[in-house]
Structure formats: C-alpha cells, structure tokens
C-alpha cells in the first residue's frame, strides 16, 4: 500500500516540477550576485549533499547570513528550486546558503533533519571562507522546508532533542527564523496526517504513537527558541491553518513571534508560498522586504 501511495505522490510532484520549471522560466535572476556552487557538505558524493552560496558582488565588510531550506513535500526538489528566491534575498544585502537534502522515500524526515544539521555544521566550519557575519544568522524555510527549519531551530537550543534525532551540535546561533507556510503538524487526522506519517516512515493509516511528529510536542524541550516570523496567505491550502496554529503555539509558549497572514491581493487569493514562487511579483516583493527588515531588526536587538 505504501509503495502505491508513494507512486501516486511521485506523479503529483512530477506535475508540480513542470509547473515550477515553467514559473522559473518566466523569471530572471537579479544582477550583481556572485554565485559559488556545489560545495559538498558531506564527503559521500551524494548529489543532494551539496549547497550553494550567493552574495552581492559589490559589498563592504561581512554580510548578515541567511540559510534557506527548500520545500517540496519532503519528496521533491533541490537547491535549484529556491535559487531565484535565495538570490533575491542576497540582492537585499545578505549572504545566502542554499542547500539540498535527501528526499523521501529514500530517507525519512528525521534523516532529512540530519542532512540539514550536517549542512549547518559545514557552514559553521567553513563560514570564514566567505564574507559572512557569523553573529548575524537567520534560518528560513518554506512548506516542508519550513517544517525542517522549525525543527532545526529547536535542535539548535536543545541537547535532549539533538540526542533524540541523533544530530551533533552544529555550533550556530540563529538570531531569528522565517517560516513560510510551515507544515509543522504531521500526525493529524485526514490525508495530511497519512502523508505526514509516511514521510516519517510510519504507517499512514493509523495514528502514530512515536513522539515529536507535531511541533507542539517539542516546543517545551526548546527553551530559548529564536524569534520567528511566520508567513501564510488566503490561498495557502496546504498550510494556512498550520501556520496560524504554530503562531498561536509560539504566543502561548512565550516565543517572540510575528504572523504575516496575507488576504486576497488585487482580488485574488495568494497561493501557497507565493513569495518563494515569485519573489519579485507585486505581492512577493513587499513580502521579501518585510522578511529582510525583520532580520535586520533582530541583528540589532
């Protein structure tokens, strides 16, 4: 049954890949951005254990750092998926690390977290090769990448969680996190829960008794969680309720949090991760500016 479901989901993500490729073909990269590509953050030769670095060609001194984790339902995509988005972040005066990680069904979500943490360890050990300010770091992610980023931020401040997920302390402090449409509740009723449990390597059609598939199960183990900006929109059919729920959880637990909940724009619903899909659109550009301002506020805090 699970193999059949994976085949169905794989077809869905294949259609999504074609749509994303067409969307990217309509866009242009910003000018004046230096790219350094395909650094191997693990020495195993895996094509998904690579990351890129982008930053303005003309800059003065060290730049604040953004580390991005792409979305794609834990099954689809690599660093190329968010390249345009990341370069437009870099164009706002930041140095951006953009990583790939292994995908389901080859691996499960906990193993993807191990990949993300391995990339962060490499970044920590190699940051001084780049014009990067290690005292100013924001972690970002969208959709599935938002979930991975949300959990990674918890791992950064929690030794018990690092032991549970079998990851090392990667040695980075996040000034803040930006989570766009994070799918942070994966053991829930309905199709979303069935899909989420499969991504964790669990049976899809029975509620999982293992801990930590839902973010509210780990927040109490992560004191000192960094300030969080959450982004969703009226047409965010995958994660509107989840993003709002995570914002409410942060408020209850005393985490500094801000929610950007976009209504209709020019009479139309803004889709899931709209600013990531088209960062220079009339709706995406001001959203990106808000993200940059949020980061700069927490550099100065």
Predicted regions and their residues:
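Alpha/beta-hydrolase superfamily serine-hydrolase fold, recognizing
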Residues: 1-301
């Amino acid at each position: 049954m699970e193999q059949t479901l994976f085949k169905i989901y794989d077809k869905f993500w294949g259609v999504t890949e074609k749509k994303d490729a067409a969307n990217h073909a309509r866009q242009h990269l910003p000018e004046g951005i230096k790219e350094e590509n395909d650094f191997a953050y693990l020495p195993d030769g895996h094509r998904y254990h690579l990351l890129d670095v982008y930053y303005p060609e003309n800059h003065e001194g060290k730049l604040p750092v953004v580390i991005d984790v792409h979305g794609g339902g834990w099954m689809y995509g690599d660093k190329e998926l968010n390249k345009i988005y990341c370069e437009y972040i870099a164009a706002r005066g930041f140095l951006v690390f953009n990583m790939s990680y292994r995908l389901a069904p080859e691996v499960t979500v906990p193993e993807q977290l191990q990949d993300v943490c391995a990339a962060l360890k490499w970044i920590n050990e190699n940051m001084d090769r780049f014009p990067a300010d290690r005292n100013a770091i924001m972690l970002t992610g969208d959709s599935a990448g938002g979930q991975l980023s949300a959990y990674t931020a918890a791992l950064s401040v929690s030794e018990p969680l690092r032991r549970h997920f079998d990851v090392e302390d990667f040695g980075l402090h996040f000034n803040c996190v930006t989570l766009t449409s994070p799918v942070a509740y994966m053991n829930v009723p309905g199709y979303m829960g069935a899909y989420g449990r499969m991504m964790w390597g669990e049976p899809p059609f029975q509620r999982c008794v293992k801990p930590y598939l839902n973010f509210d199960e780990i927040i109490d183990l992560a004191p000192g969680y960094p300030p969080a900006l959450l982004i969703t929109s009226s047409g965010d059919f995958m994660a509107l309720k989840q993003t709002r729920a995570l914002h409410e959880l942060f408020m209850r637990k005393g985490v500094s949090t801000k929610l950007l909940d976009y209504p209709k724009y020019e009479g139309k619903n803004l889709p899931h991760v709209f600013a990531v899909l088209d960062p220079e659109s009339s709706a995406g550009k001001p959203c990106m500016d808000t993200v940059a301002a949020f980061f700069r506020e927490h550099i100065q805090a």
